[in-house]
């Protein structure tokens, strides 16, 4: 049931997006104003080293829980039945999507080309695909498409009656923020805009810091 690495090199992804799209909106009602910028990227791929190590060596990410409880239940049943590991067919665990390699057999029956139905220990799977040397990178290559609320601003123009004695022409105040909401992302646990470097390391991510979220206030006075 364990995956086999294809020895023939092939392209697994491309970090260049198909296109980017931004939507800017401005609203006003009486003395209130609201402006926002929604930005999206369609297409592009990213290899996430953070997800590779978080699921693999440490098993800290929730994605690595898939099949874990079922594997423990299968092992409890095996031990209760007094059956050796090599003689036991697991009833649960991690199931890799794919087909059996040519020449594969189970219990003496040829299963070449058939859909994989053999459960394996999730730890063994993630340990196999997260080794830096001779690892299988493909499970940690993600579609980097995303939608973000990039900017949001709310303002209020103070009525003249409140500052008339101050001899001001206008007075407005408000709050603003950037990178407030990752609305949609196909990349778990990390920001899809993360990168390893700003050079030719684009499309790779490893232990990247989250994109900074900024929140502030503004005060505009005309005299």
PLM feature segments, named:
Residues 1-223:
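Outer/extracellular conduits and scaffolds centered on Gram-negative outer-membrane beta-barrels
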